[in-house]
């Protein structure tokens, strides 16, 4: 039986393919959705012709699935788009987050043009010169402006807990949502592999806790000991349980495979992971 959610695949697993070639592969395999990571090598949000690229992408997505169209979520985890020397910097918890804020605004604009289900983003690793309270204050100060920007364009945001970042667990994400007033435009992304590493209640507990706000899901395998995205069967994830839990909580969004370090096997990995 077809699940209520849409199975997708992340373009960050196709770093050696042109974007439209990657979409063709995913369409041939039979995916219902695409998790589009902005930045190198596929869609530079700051490029002079980015608008033309987005228009072409929208048309390509509409042709997928036999013309019924593929769903899309926008991911913003590109490593060196904003700073060529420091991965992911600046983030929302840095002292100066001007570039990050503008990047997320561009992500919202592109998501609006694509009718994307959401824009997913992370908090960031706390810099050495900041205390946790500083980081939380920066998030509370900055996220409302992003929420307003997204809301004006009909776009939903989803904060992703990441191992080692200030917002690391679903409980952290729930605290953040509460701190900014539970705006309807702000939800949560859950990466099921991350749950093995940092969630006290495991994957199922995290998904159920996030359920009222769950806007985006990333699927991958992972060891319990550290943050390493792996293909299914190479870690400790109970994938049937994950899919059953998503169905049980009534999740209807995108659940996309996230294998950012497997571009070397891009044509093979989606086929192996398809219809997990």
Where on the chain are the PLM-derived regions?
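A short acidic, helix-capping loop that chelates divalent metal ions and anchors anionic groups
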Residues: 42-47, 82-92, 127-132, 196-198, ...
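Active-site-proximal loop/turn and secondary-structure-junction residues that shape catalytic pockets
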Residues: 13-15, 38-42, 78-80, 123-127, ...
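Conserved beta-strand positions in the central sheet of alpha/beta enzyme cores
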Residues: 35, 73-74, 120, 158, ...
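N-terminal pre-domain/capping segments
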Residues: 1-112, 116, 144, 212
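Flexible, glycine- and charge-enriched loops at secondary-structure boundaries
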Residues: 47-54, 93-98, 129-136, 166, ...
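Histidine-acidic metal/acid-base catalytic patches
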Residues: 1-8, 15-30, 59, 66, ...
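Conserved short-loop catalytic and cofactor-binding motifs
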Residues: 10, 45, 95, 161-164, ...
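Active-site acidic/histidine proton-transfer and metal-coordination neighborhood
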Residues: 20-21, 66, 81-187
């Amino acid at each position: 039986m077809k699940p209520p959610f849409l199975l997708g695949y992340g373009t960050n697993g196709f770093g050696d393919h042109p974007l439209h070639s990657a979409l063709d592969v995913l369409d041939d395999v039979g995916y219902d959705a695409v998790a589009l990571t902005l930045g190198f090598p596929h869609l530079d949000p700051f490029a002079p012709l980015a608008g033309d690229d987005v228009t072409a992408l929208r048309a390509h997505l509409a042709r997928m699935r036999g013309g019924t169209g593929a769903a899309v979520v926008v991911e913003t985890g590109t490593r060196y788009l904003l700073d060529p020397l420091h991965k992911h910097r600046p983030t929302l918890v840095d002292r100066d987050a001007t570039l990050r804020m503008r990047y997320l605004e561009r992500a919202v604009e592109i998501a609006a043009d694509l009718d994307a289900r959401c824009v997913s983003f992370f908090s960031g690793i706390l810099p050495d010169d900041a205390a946790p309270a500083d980081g939380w204050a920066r998030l509370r100060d900055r996220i409302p402006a992003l929420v307003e920007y997204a809301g004006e364009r009909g776009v939903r945001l989803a904060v992703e807990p990441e191992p080692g970042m200030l917002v690391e667990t679903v409980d952290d994400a729930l605290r953040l949502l509460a701190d900014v007033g539970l705006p309807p435009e702000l939800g949560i992304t859950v990466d099921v592999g991350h749950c093995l590493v940092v969630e006290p209640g495991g994957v199922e507990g995290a998904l159920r806790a996030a359920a009222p706000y769950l806007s985006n899901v990333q699927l991958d395998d992972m060891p319990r000991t550290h943050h390493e995205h792996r293909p299914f069967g190479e870690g400790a994830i109970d994938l049937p349980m994950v899919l059953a839990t998503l169905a049980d909580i009534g999740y209807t969004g995108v659940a996309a495979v996230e294998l950012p370090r497997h571009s070397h096997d891009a044509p093979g990995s989606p086929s192996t992971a398809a219809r997990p």
